[in-house]
Regions:
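Hydrophobic transmembrane alpha-helix bundles
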Residues: 109-121, 145-159, 180-191, 211-222, ...
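C-terminal alpha-helical cap/extension of soluble enzyme domains
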Residues: 3-29, 34, 39-45, 66, ...
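Glycine-centered flexibility sites
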Residues: 37, 80-83, 112, 207, ...
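Alpha-helical scaffold segments in soluble metabolic enzymes
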Residues: 62, 99, 166, 198, ...
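Catalytic alpha/beta core domains of metabolic enzymes, predominantly
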Residues: 168-315
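General structural feature for long, well-ordered alpha-helical segments within catalytic domains
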Residues: 52-59, 92, 96, 125-128, ...
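Active-site beta->alpha loop and helix N-cap motifs at the rims of alpha/beta catalytic domains
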Residues: 3-190, 342, 368-371
Length: 374
């Protein structure tokens, strides 16, 4: 079978398996020269059933320290994943953005945009995204991540494209499209190659985030965007495959960017060749620091436990694990989730996270990585 190599040959029904991009190796896409940004799904901690705003600010400053030390561009993702997005009212959503902007007036952020009030709808309505878009667009220097929703996701490719375009035409800020596999929610379907190509050509969509457990869609996206030179940045949402995005010189947009922040920032820098101007800590050999491979192992083994699947085969409780990690690092006062959050770990989570952190805590001082405890 001749594989598709041109966007002109794509049809709405074309599966990835019919394209050359589904068979492109990670090795052929390796990039040792680009220090892409790290987008961290910032935790809104709670204390005594109320938002811990001091802990929120303290955790952001800690991550800024990590980024500054290694010269990594960091963007904070608010109201998604570790922000307990599905439990925030519009009022608390707006307050998170206001407080962040007041404390960090020049810091870029991405904010998750979900459909509101669609629970009883029988068909997709783009205006359901407008309330949070309006709140977000009160702020400058931010991007909008258009989170997938059931009624958006179940549309056929052409109707789904039209829906994304309706949303894109409403926004005034740069937007990021968000895709999931059914391994995360049962109704989710990743973008077909035709749909990805269509979204990538809309001027408001500067990139997309894809999260998968079973099929390497981030690799497909990366191969297509590089081959076709699309003005669209694939962002990896794969907390189970963090090293891949670093190796490809592409952005990460992950909850693991919080708990493993100094480790990931260090890896970003170590992967670069000495000849790259942005490299902060050069090897003196002209090459990259091959010790990064052991760092990859250390932070992935750690995050595999943070993101371990529960009895429902869901990784959603990782946000509770993240709170335990930040608490053990002395950054927040309590490992407490949002009071309405149902995705919780067990009573032994503090011990489990202590065990999970042993290897990264061992390797961090050996590689001179600061900000990760003793």
């Amino acid at each position: 079978m001749d594989l598709i190599t041109s966007a002109a040959d794509l049809k709405p029904s074309t599966p990835w398996s019919d394209t050359i991009w589904a068979y492109t190796s990670e090795e052929s896409l390796v990039d040792h020269e680009t220090k892409a940004r790290l987008c961290v799904a910032t935790l809104l901690p709670f204390k005594d059933k109320k938002p811990d705003w001091d802990g929120f600010t303290k955790s952001v400053r800690w991550m800024q320290q990590c980024a500054d030390h290694y010269g990594v561009e960091m963007v904070f993702v608010l109201n998604a994943d570790t922000g307990y997005i599905f439990d925030l009212s519009n009022e608390l959503y707006a307050e998170v953005l206001r407080r962040f902007r007041a404390d960090f007036p020049t810091q870029r952020f991405i904010t998750g945009i979900t459909a509101r009030g669609a629970e009883n709808d029988s068909e997709f309505k783009s205006e359901r995204y407008h309330p949070l878009i309006d709140i977000a667009q009160e702020h400058d220097n931010c991007e909008l991540m258009i989170m997938t929703s059931r009624l958006l996701n179940i549309l056929e490719p052409e109707a789904r494209r039209d829906a994304y375009f309706e949303i894109g035409d409403y926004v005034t800020h740069p937007a990021i499209a968000h895709a999931l596999e059914p391994s995360f929610v049962s109704w989710a379907t990743p973008y077909e190659p035709w749909l990805l190509h269509q979204i990538a050509q809309h001027p408001k969509y500067v990139g997309g985030k894809v999260s998968t457990l079973d099929e390497p869609h981030f690799l497909y996206w990366s191969a297509m965007c590089k081959d076709l030179r699309l003005p669209f940045a694939p962002h990896s949402g794969d907390d189970y495959g963090i090293a891949s995005a670093i190796k490809l010189g592409l952005p990460l947009l992950i909850g693991a960017g919080v708990s493993a922040c100094p480790l990931i920032c260090a890896a970003r820098d170590m992967w670069l060749l000495d000849s790259v101007a942005d490299k902060k800590f050069k090897t003196g050999s002209g090459r990259f620091d091959t010790r990064v491979y052991k760092l990859f192992e250390a932070f992935q083994s750690f995050e595999d436990l943070v993101f371990r699947l529960d009895d429902r085969l869901s990784a959603s409780p990782y946000k509770h694990s993240t709170a335990h990690v930040l608490h053990q690092l002395g950054i927040i006062d309590a490992p407490e989730p949002h009071p309405d959050c149902k995705d919780l770990r067990g009573a032994d989570e503090a011990l489990r996270m202590q065990e999970a952190m042993r290897r990264p805590k061992r390797i961090a001082p050996r590689l001179g990585i600061p900000f990760f405890g003793a």
